[in-house]
Amino acid sequence: MHILLVADGRSPITRRWVRAVVALQHQVTLVSTFPCSAVDGVSALHVMPVAFAGMGGSQVGVAGAPSPGRSRQLVSRFRSVFLSARYYLGPLSLLFFARRFRRLIAEVKPDLVHALRIPFEGMLASQTPASIPIAVTIWGNDLTYHALGSPWMKALTLMTLRRANGLLADAHRDIRLGQLWGFAAERPALVVPGGAGIDLGEMHRLRAQFVESFADLLPAGVPMVVNPRGFRPGSVRNDVFFQAIPLVLERKPKVFFVCTGMAGQPEALRWVQELKLEGHIRLLPFLPQPQLWDLFVRANIFVSVSAHDGTPNSFLEGIACGCFPVVGDIESLREWVTPGGNGFLVEPHKPQALADALVVALDNPDLLSNAAEKNLQLIRQRAEAGMVRAQIEIFYQRLAGSGAASLTTTP
């Protein structure tokens, strides 16, 4: 089968999905909505920077990506303003790229088009001719946050979900929300991790091969809390995370905090200075996957204070490596976390609640140990890569075999 993926080619999630699809013996053409380096496994790579993606409007880290230029530094400083502008100007850019996308479809003749999120990849993919089925993956904040960004975002989200022949998400909540937004309930839907599953063997093997050390960056022999989420406006409440740190240090002065994707970020530097956190925190850049996994193994606790989210791949990787999760109390993460059993859920707007949960976890090593065993079993039961690939294959074959005409409803 020839599958045309529409995704951010810089993203580790995209690259893992490509590897999974290629492992299923399918041909992959990638349309990247961001400029990116070569992607292993694809037969062809085309870049269509919709919504001014060339300026770097989202955060991902991948080896070989272009270094941030002045425009990306400005985006970092004025991230919220830039995001708001994209909600109004981004949809207009689709008018320019739609014709180019349809020409590419006519040229490569894929059997199936799959967009790895709704804005703006799914919106572009919705321009696929009706004779070709399309699958759309929902990310956790696509419907609860981005779709409400402007009237144009709402209209294009509705159009995308009505056009979609199949829907994927990493949480059952998002399939339900997708149906409320116009996806037909009788069409195929699949809940699987967005990164095509967790390969425990690969994680162990690549960690063993990775030679770079944290010895000069992080203190040894102290409790460690890791926040790997970077800055995601409107989704992750890093303001709450930083405000909780002094509250933890009052009771646990030896705890050390590590944040990836925050090195040099003005917002992070401002919080560190204002809250006098120097010596208690390390702001790291985005890390290669093996190094991130090694950090998870070294850390005691994984923190993600999400207000809008699905099931973050970093969450699955963190619990697979033994981290105890302390995460926002949102519906998608309730599908994974039993409070006091294998993690804690906290109100995402309350620094004191987060601090209390961190202190309780750090005071209970048996809780952390038992949770690590439970979470590893959860990964094996619900997110193991081989099992997920088999589910993806069945889903793709069902879409391609049914024919788009029988699956498409006129908006």
List where the protein language model places each region.
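Glycosyltransferase donor-sugar binding loop
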Residues: C36, P228-F231, F256-L269
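Short hydrophobic beta-strand element within catalytic cores of glycosyltransferases
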Residues: F324-V327
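Conserved donor-binding/catalytic core segment of Leloir-type glycosyltransferases
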Residues: L168, G195, V211-V236, F242-I245, ...
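Aromatic "clamp/platform" in nucleotide-sugar-dependent glycosyltransferases that forms part
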Residues: A307
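Donor nucleotide-sugar binding/catalytic pocket of nucleotide-sugar-dependent glycosyltransferases
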Residues: M48, V136-W139, K154-E212, P219, ...
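Short alpha-helical donor nucleotide-sugar binding micro-motif in glycosyltransferases
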Residues: F286-L287, D294-A299
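Nucleotide-activated donor-binding/catalytic signature segment of Leloir-type glycosyltransferases, i.e.
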Residues: L269-L287
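Conserved acidic donor-binding segment of nucleotide-sugar-dependent glycosyltransferases
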Residues: P339-G340, F344-P351, V360-D366
